[in-house]
Amino acid sequence: MADETMTGEQILEHVEHKSFAATSDRTAASLSASGVAAEDVARAAAQAAYDKKGEDVQVLDLTELSDVCDYFVLATGTNNRQADSIVDEIEEKVAEACGEHPFSIEGREQKTWMLMDYGSVVVHVFTPEARDFYRLEKLWGDAPQLPLNLL
């Protein structure tokens, strides 16, 4: 990866910028733009990633840690093509289940780290190498994981 010379501080700054580039507006009740609970959007995204064979699917609860978003959804595709397919599946299934569409999707060109910004929910889909490099779980180590019953 070209970013391997970045310092820890630069990585954190990059992650914060990438995670919150499209919006920094939150509602007090953690509702999405259409009034759906942010947790429901996060769970729908996680289920969609799992359904598309995403690996290590997690939802980090940031409600007590961040003023910008409430949940991170993390998933890994085995390669660029699968990661891109996971993003498509999440976009479709979250729209069906919650009536939500992302404000923006970043990283579609490189397909190593794609980010879907739903406002109070930010979805990160990685290739294995990018997930290992950025380690968002470590950067947000204080964030509890939502228990998921992925079927």
Predicted feature descriptions by range:
Residues 93-122:
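Mid-chain, well-packed structural core segment of small domains
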Residues 1-59, 63-64, 81, 85-88, ...:
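Long, contiguous binding/interaction regions
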Residues 69-71:
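Short amphipathic alpha-helical segments
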